[in-house]
Amino acid sequence: MSVLDALWEDRDVRFDLSSQQMKTRPGEVLIDCLDSIEDTKGNNGDRGRLLVTNLRILWHSLALSRVNVSVGYNCILNITTRTANSKLRGQTEALYILTKCNSTRFEFIFTNLVPGSPRLFTSVMAVHRAYETSKMYRDFKLRSALIQNKQLRLLPQEHVYDKINGVWNLSSDQGNLGTFFITNVRIVWHANMNDSFNVSIPYLQIRSIKIRDSKFGLALVIESSQQSGGYVLGFKIDPVEKLQESVKEINSLHKVYSASPIFGVDYEMEEKPQPLEALTVEQIQDDVEIDSDDHTDAFVAYFADGNKQQDREPVFSEELGLAIEKLKDGFTLQGLWEVMS
């Protein structure tokens, strides 16, 4: 299994997380912590804390820590500032985040309850930009600008452990002769005749590394994660001793990377925040049994009805005694009142 298969923090939007899911995963770093932040869209009037990591934004209520939300950077479509109506601050400038997760759009509005502080905007926007500009660490890439003057263009925090000349890429019937790089974050190969014919495979995207027989003889076979397209890539490294040595080295580096991934999001605050575990309140189990059969209530307030081109037809509500816009499938008036209360 690739590291990516277990990674959800930057690729998902989740609500009402457990205390375990609120903790940082290996490779995740807390960059900033902002107290007195209101989740104006979903929990207006509720003072909370916003945590900015290299993978996601976390918000939790200070009064009830199980009221929380996690927004992965890979889900973010747009970040802007807008005027919002806060119960705690009135009309004020707020951070507006539009996201898309599994074809569903959510919007979030966060308001800093400390007047005159731009830190909410600068922190989130800067870290999200750092995430967007460091995708080479995390994404499987074909035909990218990897090589300059026959040398690998190293990423920050990247170190080359081995460079192997005369490696055949077995993606075609004849094979292509090229150069193979093994680093601490990825595998790179490029053709000698045309260095724009290349591939970059981060350890994050590698599902398996094996030696298999092919029509060219024994070859290194790398299978990528399903999220990257499930590629199976073959490389011919001679002699066999060098092939075995390379596979051993790649497996070793992949194991080290899996234990402590390098996601490449490099951003530091002048003031170091406390560890995430010290900032999130442990959820206390009480005697009240919570019915969790219906999960729509937790996130209904965040829906961004982006596909709605016009108002839905009015229908008569016997419960309210007046005409209302027809509700979307799966939602009830009772459920909406529960969110508001």
Swiss-Prot record:
This is BBSome complex member BBS5. Part of BBSome complex, that contains BBS1, BBS2, BBS4, BBS5, BBS7, BBS8/TTC8, BBS9 and BBIP10. Binds to phosphoinositides. Interacts with CCDC28B. Interacts with SMO; the interaction is indicative for the association of SMO with the BBsome complex to facilitate ciliary localization of SMO. Interacts with PKD1. Interacts with DLEC1. One of its GO terms (cellular component) is centriolar satellite. Transmembrane segments: none annotated. It is found in: Cell projection, Cilium membrane; Cytoplasm; Cytoplasm, Cytoskeleton, Cilium basal body; Cytoplasm, Cytoskeleton, Microtubule organizing center, Centrosome, Centriolar satellite. PANTHER family: BARDET-BIEDL SYNDROME 5 PROTEIN, BARDET-BIEDL SYNDROME PROTEIN 5. The BBSome complex is thought to function as a coat complex required for sorting of specific membrane proteins to the primary cilia. The BBSome complex is required for ciliogenesis but is dispensable for centriolar satellite function. This ciliogenic function is mediated in part by the Rab8 GDP/GTP exchange factor, which localizes to the basal body and contacts the BBSome. Rab8(GTP) enters the primary cilium and promotes extension of the ciliary membrane. SMART domains: DM16. It comes from the Eukaryota. Belongs to the BBS5 family. It holds the Pfam family BBL5. InterPro entries: BBL5, BBS5/fem-3, BBS5_PH, PH-like_dom_sf. One of its GO terms (molecular function) is phosphatidylinositol-3-phosphate binding. One of its GO terms (biological process) is cilium assembly. Keywords: Cell membrane, Cell projection, Cilium, Cilium biogenesis/degradation, Cytoplasm, Cytoskeleton, Membrane, Protein transport, Transport.
